Amino acid sequence: IVGGYECEAYSKPYQVSINLGY
């Protein structure tokens, strides 16, 4: 998972978290 692209499939809030790296 890089940049939160994969996480978009999980949940929107998590996408932001991974995108920021937190």
Curated annotation (Swiss-Prot):
UniProt keywords, alphabetically: Cytoplasm, Hydrolase, Protease, Serine protease
Entry EC number(s): 3.4.21.-
Gene Ontology terms for molecular function: serine-type peptidase activity
Hydrolase is among the record's keywords? yes
Residue span, Peptidase S1 domain: 1-22
According to the record, how does pH govern the activity? Optimum pH is 9.0. Active from pH 5.0 to 11.0.
- The broad enzyme category this protein falls into is hydrolase
Which terms does the UniProt entry file under GO BP? proteolysis
Q: In which tissues is it expressed?
A: Detected in skeletal muscle (at protein level).
Which Gene Ontology cellular component annotation is one that this UniProt entry carries? cytoplasm
What's the family? Belongs to the peptidase S1 family.
What does the UniProt record say this protein does? Serine protease which degrades the myosin heavy chain and tropomyosin, but not actin. Selectively cleaves Arg-|-Xaa bonds.
What protein is this chain from? Myofibril-bound serine protease
